[in-house]
From Swiss-Prot:
Cellular component terms (Gene Ontology): chloroplast
Protein function: Usually encoded in the trnK tRNA gene intron. Probably assists in splicing its own and other chloroplast group II introns.
Family classification: Belongs to the intron maturase 2 family. MatK subfamily.
Keywords: Chloroplast, mRNA processing, Plastid, RNA-binding, tRNA processing
Compartments in which it is found: Plastid, Chloroplast
The protein's name: Maturase K
Xref: InterPro entries: Domain_X (IPR024937), Maturase_MatK (IPR002866), Maturase_MatK_N (IPR024942)
One Gene Ontology term from the biological process aspect of the record: RNA splicing
Domain of life: Eukaryota
Organism lineage string: Eukaryota, Viridiplantae, Streptophyta, Embryophyta, Tracheophyta
MF terms (GO), sorted A to Z: RNA binding
Length: 503
């Protein structure tokens, strides 16, 4: 975007949020496809695919025609477009259009006076950066709102919402054409197979629409936290780096402060905290159960009035941290009370002091993961390992490498769990499944095959950290087991593990 800024400054249209003329600029498609500006992508030839500005202009004109499905049989170019080339040209324009509609958010970001105060760190992209935040804050909170962000009932509502950011009617009409081009476009945000090809061919446009949709819903959560919190936490501010549209927050605060100043007295709370991952958000508070009910219905009514979307009350759950587990990004997290007895002696008198402390306890959802392994044909529904028959035709090294990679990724992602027995069970299932797959391939017994491979076979299922720790720590010492039992969060995990995201 830094390189892109120099080009959009040459255009006068962006100053008034008129972006439609930019789609005819050649450098837009160069940036969208990651090509060098010195090498024109619109003049590049790849097989029978030719690019030119004339193609783009004719394509948009043809898309606006009401009789675009009535084509001449003698026009081979038109038949090619509405045949196998239709998807390609549509993808090309949608990529350029996606880059253009991102301009308002980028301009707000570079114009924000607070941009220098936001910490730039790649570690903030890690999912595991959320858990130290939860460990620090959840011990002092009581209740959590478990929120599933609602899907739009009609994408026309999303287009209307974009009007607040993009004032160019031509760009909005072009967006409607992209959406109406596909069947079941009203179900764009619902995970169905009918929209798989739309997402595959238009990833950038799909991600922009989804992020914008989530950002609009999440803005009210940021507003509540900013207005209600008297002592703003630095860790909370750092987590805002995880969203790419934080530049609009200052504008929203001014808008909401003017319109909702008389309502906020109902929601004063000294310590609300909000965290989101994909379409799920949590809003934790130290307030009473009655206050959480107020927040719940306030969010429902606000979304209904602002987005014309009726959100079912069951999509927002109120959980007590002391009695319920929070299902979030692949962990069952809760706050447990741990008792410890301290012996104190003063002269000849001895006292036993019973201390109760809170401890953040993230658990592995073992039942869900076993179901995911069973779905992937690594075991049955009861957790008994079976052979992976699909991989029998692969070489031995490829089979071991695939099983080992899955096992290491699971160990890496769930290293923060306080209870490692569930993780050991998952690793055991993968080890035996790998052994049975190899034994089935070579038509031998599992026990005899494991005996022939020896200990080198098991090393493929250990992470690099586990190999180092096994050399440093004593094997029979109690300290080694205590160290492995602790939580270890890594700052290089940018997405949830696929097995933990089984839906």
């Amino acid at each position: 975007m830094e390189e892109f800024q120099g080009y959009i400054e040459l255009e006068g249209s962006w100053q008034h949020n008129f972006f439609y003329p930019l789609i005819f600029q050649e450098y837009i498609f160069s940036f969208a496809y990651g090509h060098d500006l010195n090498k024109s992508i619109l003049l590049e030839t790849s097989g029978n695919r030719k690019y030119s500005l004339l193609i783009v202009k004719r394509l948009i004109t043809r898309m606006y025609q009401h009789n675009h499905l009535i084509l001449s049989s003698n026009d081979s170019n038109q038949n090619d477009f509405w045949g196998h080339k239709r998807n390609f040209y549509s993808q090309m324009i949608s990529e350029g259009f996606s880059l253009i509609v991102e301009i308002p958010f980028y301009l707000l970001l570079i114009a924000s006076p607070e941009k220098k105060k936001i910490v730039k760190s790649h570690n903030l992209r890690s999912i595991h950066s959320i858990f130290p935040f939860l460990e620090d804050k959840f011990l002092h909170l009581n209740s959590v709102l478990d929120i599933l962000l609602p899907y739009p009932t009609h994408l026309e509502i999303l287009v209307q919402t974009l009007r607040y950011w993009i004032r160019d009617a031509s760009s909005l009409h072009l967006l409607r054409l992209f959406l109406y081009e596909y069947h079941n476009w009203n179900s764009l945000f619902i995970p169905k197979k009918s929209i798989y090809f739309f997402f595959k061919r238009n990833q950038r446009l799909f991600l922009f629409l989804y992020n914008f949709h989530v950002c609009e819903y999440e803005s009210i959560l940021f507003f509540i936290c900013n207005q209600s919190s008297h002592l703003r936490a630095t860790s909370y501010g750092a987590l805002l780096e995880r969203t790419f549209f934080y530049g609009k927050l200052e504008y929203l605060v001014k808008l909401f402060t003017k319109d909702f100043a008389g309502i906020l007295w109902l929601f004063k709370d000294p310590s609300p905290h909000s965290v989101r991952y994909k379409g799920k958000s949590i809003l934790a508070s130290k307030g009473t159960f009655f206050l959480m009910h107020k927040w719940k219905f306030y969010l429902i009514y606000f979304w209904q009035c602002n987005f014309s979307v009726w959100s079912h009350p069951r999509r927002i759950y109120i959980n007590r941290l002391s009695t319920h587990c929070l299902d979030f990004i692949g962990f069952f997290s809760s706050v447990q009370l741990t008792s410890s007895v301290v012996r104190s002696q003063i002269l000849e008198n001895t006292f036993l002091i019973d201390n109760t402390i809170k401890r953040f306890d993230p658990k592995i959802p073992i039942s869900t993961l076993i179901g995911s392994l069973a779905k992937a044909q690594f075991c049955n529904r009861l957790g008994h390992p079976i052979s992976k028959s699909v991989w029998i035709d692969l070489s031995d090294s490829d089979i071991i490498d695939r099983f080992g990679r899955i096992c290491r990724n699971l160990s890496h992602y769930y290293s923060g769990s306080s209870r490692k027995k569930s993780l050991y069970r998952l690793k055991y299932i993968l080890k035996i499944s790998c052994a049975r797959t190899l034994a089935r391939k070579h038509k031998s017994a599992v026990r005899a095959f494991l005996k022939r491979l020896g200990s080198e076979f098991l090393e493929e299922f250990f992470t690099e950290q586990e190999k180092v720790l096994s050399l440093i720590l004593p094997k029979n010492g109690s300290n080694s087991w205590g160290f492995y039992g602790g939580s270890i969060w890594y700052l290089d995990i940018i997405c949830i593990h696929n097995l933990a995201n089984d839906e």
